[in-house]
Amino acid sequence: MKNILEMLEYSAERFPDKYVFRDENTDMTYAEFLRTAKNIGTDIAKHGINNKPIAVIAERSAGCLAAMFGVLYSGNFYTVIDSEMPPERVKAIFETLKPAAVVVTKACLSLLKKLDFNGKAVNYETAKDCPADSNLLGKVRENMIDSDPAYALFTSGSTGVPKGAVVSHKAVLSYVKWYSDTFKIDENTVFGSQTPFYFSMSVSDVFSTVYAGGELNIIPKTLFSFPMKLLELLNERRVNTIYWVPSALCIIANWRVLDYGELKYIKKVLFAGEVMPTRQLNYWIEKLPYALFANLFGPTETTDICTYYIVDRKFKDGETLPIGRACDNCDVFVLKEDGTKAKTGEEGELYARGSFLAMGYYNNPEKTAAASISPSSIL
């Protein structure tokens, strides 16, 4: 494969009538999702925009995912703007991104109006019903290669100024294969997705789902304030795999929710993005003794993850979880302040190299150069 879209097309051919993405209002089968993405891609491609950044302003929904894939079909790359983002942050992102167009849902038009955006706006509700032009999409596809950017995720980092890490199709394909192989993601996998689509953890959920022919359920944010209802949804949808930030897992543990209700189908509990407290982890392990638990670690710049640790022993409350070993086809190492490799027990800064790496920060060569090192310094 050289393109993310090939993953979707392969799974849609195998499982056309199976659900791929479900939110609280919409259930989309693989066939429906593929058709919608191609329709949106056609509507964008008609404007002659190619290999440019396109912002997707949408609520967290199956429709947002269709718009993301639609941007890819148009031969461009996307940046997700969540409907709850403050307008000032979006303006700061747009200042760097300078999007060639915006795909926006009706519900998010009010946010778009606050941005003083004068470029092309594509209405999601209209675009999703635009008949797909297979000839146009075919011409676009002919010119796409695996090193083309797929998306840019913006992270503030330590400065508070948004930086857009650009990730290629090749990086996603390499990462998703590792993730799916390692955690045995397949057509029987049913994700319960907690993270926003502008956060790198969602890359694992979304793209491994279409790679393997699985199903992803978008959990409403409000349910984390009503944990018993959250359990009901997870059981009703037969969710068997979750990849959440630790603070979400801690809600269940701190309220001891699993003392009052069970999770009938969960087989894999993965977490990243924050430090997982071992006291709360021990609660989960006690309640789900046969589940796989794994601590994943990595910055946005490594697509999502560069190291992982499958929990294989008991930890005392307060004990630190290791970040584990490097992912396959990804190398991690520690450099000291003088630029030399740290030895066991020495401190330094963690670096990564491999196919998962982002292309750099969009429209920001200074930050890209500052975050990179010469290959000669590590070989």
Range-by-range predicted roles:
Residues 24, 152, 194-195, 219, ...:
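Short hydrophobic "strand-cap" motifs at the C-terminus of beta-strands
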Residues 1-5, 87, 102-142, 172, ...:
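AMP-dependent adenylate-forming
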Residues 54, 71, 102, 149, ...:
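Conserved S/T- and glycine-rich ATP-binding loop of Class I adenylate-forming
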Residues 58-61, 82, 185, 195-202, ...:
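Conserved AMP-binding
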Residues 88-89, 226-229, 279-280:
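Short acidic active-site motifs
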Residues 212-214, 239-243, 253-322, 331:
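Gly/Ser/Thr-rich phosphate-binding loop
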Residues 1-170, 183-184, 213:
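Carrier-protein-dependent adenylate-forming modules in NRPS/ANL systems
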Residues 163-192, 200-240:
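Conserved AMP-binding/adenylation subdomain of ANL enzymes
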